[in-house]
């Protein structure tokens, strides 16, 4: 069995509907049995991000807070992929 790959998907937008893009991304990811996706609307759950191998973001005017930016930067520097 292939190892599970945890993915953190941030899909949200203030000014338009993100549902279509979110669904299409999930369909693409679902083609890979080893991928497990956590889908969220912001960047603030750093503990979950740190558990993941990589993060995908599809957003419109949704930004991480300064604290989340710092934590995400450390996560990327430690090998996390975004």
What are the language-model segments listed below?
Residues 1-53:
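Aromatic-Pro/Gly-enriched surface loop or interdomain linker
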Residues 10, 50-82:
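Short alpha-beta junction capping motif
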């Amino acid at each position: 069995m292939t190892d599970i790959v945890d993915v953190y998907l941030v899909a949200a937008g203030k000014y338009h509907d993100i549902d279509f893009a979110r669904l299409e991304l999930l369909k693409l990811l679902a083609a890979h049995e080893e991928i497990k996706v956590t889908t969220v609307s912001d960047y603030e759950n750093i503990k979950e991000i740190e558990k993941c191998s990589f993060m995908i973001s599809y957003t419109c005017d949704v930004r991480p807070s300064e604290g989340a930016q710092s934590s995400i930067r450390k996560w990327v520097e430690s090998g996390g992929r975004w």
